[in-house]
């Protein structure tokens, strides 16, 4: 799955096709075989959801095989998310079309309200937005990306079969203590930020449970090589 948070973001079929071509051109020789080859590499492109996203463009992209999913970034929640969604109410036509098409919505599940503690942003997103989204669009396929809390694990487990979640390797390895061990360690900071040990244990239990609702998400945002 290729994330669409470039600058400018991947919001059209043409932009996704151009980005896919760039990715394929950068493949090392050992990954240059056709998709059917055992070592082949097939980038699955996604569309960046915005307040003014067009349902017809997303439907054409999905039906043509260009878009595999749509990615929801709350505006200013993470890397290159300035163009993200400010109000899910503005996206209802797109979400209804996706529900009809059985097209997955991939969600960075954090609120950006400055009044919410950074360690609570995932939990509050679930309470304020995800619960309502699932209620309003019960057939919508949703993946809650890079979950970091027991709250998210419990929500996904309790939800229907259309709801899943990814878990990153680093959120299985570190808790929030790692950020402050012997001073501030900025290379341990990521978004969503690591949480307390009880949450890490819940993630590990989910990742090793055999429950197909939970699967790997490497969560590497697009950055220039020099960064």
Q: Where are the regions that the model predicts?
A:
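Conserved active-site loop/cleft motifs that coordinate metal ions or position small ligands
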Residues: 1-2, 215-217
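Histidine/acidic residue-rich metal-binding segments in metalloenzymes
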Residues: 53-72, 78-216
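Short, intrinsically disordered, charge-balanced linker/junction segments flanking boundaries
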Residues: 225-227
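Metal-cofactor-binding active-site regions of metalloenzymes
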Residues: 1-82
